[in-house]
Amino acid sequence: MSELLSFALFLASVLIYAWKAGRNTWWFAATLTVLGLFVVLNITLFASDYFTGDGINDAVLYTLTNSLTGAGVSKYILPGIGIVLGLAAVFGALGWILRRRRHHPHHFGYSLLALLLALGSVDASPAFRQITELVKSQSRDGDPDFAAYYKEPSRTIPDPKLNLVYIYGESLERTYFDNEAFPDLTPELGALKNEGLDFSHTQQLPGTDYTIAGMVASQCGIPLFAPFEGNASASVSSFFPQNICLGDILKNSGYQNYFVQGANLRFAGKDVFLKSHGFDHLYGSEELKSVVADPHYRNDWGFYDDTVLDEAWKKFEELSRSGQRFSLFTLTVDTHHPDGFISRTCNRKKYDFDGKPNQSFSAVSCSQENIATFINKIKASPWFKDTVIVVSSDHLAMNNTAWKYLNKQDRNNLFFVIRGDKPQQETLAVKRNTMDNGATVLDILGGDNYLGLGRSSLSGQSMSEIFLNIKEKTLAWKPDIIRLWKFPKEMKEFTIDQQKNMIAFSGSHFRLPLLLRVSDKRVEPLPESEYSAPLRFQLADFAPRDNFVWVDRCYKMAQLWAPELALSTDWCVSQGQLGGQQIVQHVDKAIWKGKTAFKDTVIDMARYKGNVDTLKIVDNDIRYKADSFIFNVAGAPEEVKQFSGISRPESWGRWSNAQLGDEVKIEYKHPLPKKFDLVITAKAYGNNASRPIPVRVGNEEQTLVLGNEVTTTTLHFDNPTDADTLVIVPPEPVSTNEGNILGHSPRKLGIGMVEIKVVEREG
């Protein structure tokens, strides 16, 4: 209803101003600004829905001040460009319409009415309401009743008798199991769901709407609200360190806790969370690659679900035979947005909807078959009678190719339980949320029936039942939940441990690199993650007087304040204000101690603008003084005009990447010498080893042969035509996820370059 009212007010404002208000520059500018705000808000809502499937939420608020990089982002580039172009077109059209009768005399009454209607359209828009609520949630002090509802359970289960298998289905919400809406989509897992305790109304709350947040909610009974963006949790050394979570209780009760997934454990700090709360045995893509049957059988995120669930079954067998009490948690990935992935062993590889194949539905149908196969193995085993199996979604599906069809349904998260000791077949329609999952499992295992804000759906009353406005209530509790981190409010001294790549201050520890905004009563950590912008881009958003401490590789800050360190990959510490003074210190000891030293100086806005502009220079446009191209730092020597076909810097150098260009091309600002030696320090990837690699300068071509290890080769060139471009053509680029950023499409690697140097020859 509010959408219709908002649009009606917008349309009325446009028509009244265009046809009645007449000519006045001030009223035109004011009305266009407010109407433009309406357009921006609604496009933001549309774009947010596209990325999150949940409107403007905490993740979007973070992204508005940073950058969305990371998982699958390349698939969103075209929609993003479309939104920008559409916004420009709408603004242009809006300005043209409002000035249709600019030659008519100004009418104050109609101008005022049009402006008021425009303001009303903004106020009534859902986007404005969502942003207002989010901003309020950032500034609240908390809610006094939080302590009454947040309850810590007993740290042990008195007499545990059952093992636990807990399966997180990536984005595998219960909506997919509606056979009327999506016929025969989930027959195998749906049949198992109907054999157990099926909780049909598990809603999603703020702070529980992405994987690590859903895991925290289901195991600790609280949303993931933190003093930093949730997916940046990989940078912290401990996770809600004061809280008691399901894993802690299981460990204290004699359980050995295991976690198995196909993706890298470091992503979003799942390893930190699990290690902080009772899990001693973790298996992700790095740990599994040496034990799986086919280490090359991977998707963009890691190993396929069939591989992961096969390993989970092996672990279940091994642990069951040992006779020890255990919990085995596993997380699938094949149903990850935007398209999903199809395991090669499943029979259900294709699902048509609306008369055409749908990749997301196909991935769901395949993944549920793999999960069902795993569960049926457990059910057929002699150990099932001592086992509780839990299947849940980590969160509702985000914007995938099935999302518009899901949105036509009443959407809920998946949560069902199959008990080997006491078979129960029932659908429970009680209102609940993800935070109740852990408490329900704890209750079944013989522990308390509460866990944080979660309550057992078998013997307690969910917050979703107590509060009709549970989403608003959850946001009201956000400051209280953030305080559970016990995060420090000041930073005076700090220590950097180079061996561990950690910084410590005021009792807190963070992985490097790290950016901190330091004020009188608050220290705000801004880690670097797959979903956040590089730290220098985040620093560029600081105000001129904001105090900062930035710990990163020296070369990243050298272009601003320490050019002598432009080629150093050591750690450096920079601190100060962007509009004031900055210092850079080289971390030259294994354990390096520093102090914050912020001076109250006069702010220089010209200096501030220069710093911001330099921080925002993209990597490929950075230039440094050097007599060779050093590939393990960003940018290129000053003599290089541009380059292409080269991937990002890594600790050792850079790979060529045929996704960015079939050949490595380095164009210099001036012609290369008439005679020169080209000294190349490099290695080859895969089948490119021991193969002739053409290297061209102008009309002359030499051959380079590389092995799998780094070697240095000198090629002799004559350049009578004054060519200015060096071209290297890897013969057989290999598509691989090796060394890739999690969730990105595979790179096509050819050669790995450490250094290229042009040495002029006499004669």
Swiss-Prot record:
The keyword Electron transport does not apply. It is a multi-pass membrane protein. It comes from the Bacteria. GO terms for molecular function: phosphatidylglycerol-membrane-oligosaccharide glycerophosphotransferase activity. GO terms for cellular component: plasma membrane. It is an enzyme of class 2 (transferase). Keywords: Cell inner membrane, Cell membrane, Membrane, Transferase, Transmembrane, Transmembrane helix. InterPro entries: Alkaline_phosphatase_core_sf, DUF7024, OpgB, OpgB/LTA_synthase_biosynth, Sulfatase_N. GO terms for biological process: glucan biosynthetic process. It catalyses: a phosphatidylglycerol + a membrane-derived-oligosaccharide D-glucose = a 1,2-diacyl-sn-glycerol + a membrane-derived-oligosaccharide 6-(glycerophospho)-D-glucose. Its main location: membrane. The keyword Signal does not apply. The chain crosses the membrane at residues 1-21, 26-46, 77-97, 108-128. Pfam families: DUF7024 (PF22895), Sulfatase (PF00884). It is found in: Cell inner membrane. Transfers a phosphoglycerol residue from phosphatidylglycerol to the membrane-bound nascent glucan backbones. Belongs to the OpgB family. This is Phosphoglycerol transferase I. It comes from Escherichia coli O81 (strain ED1a). The gene is mdoB.
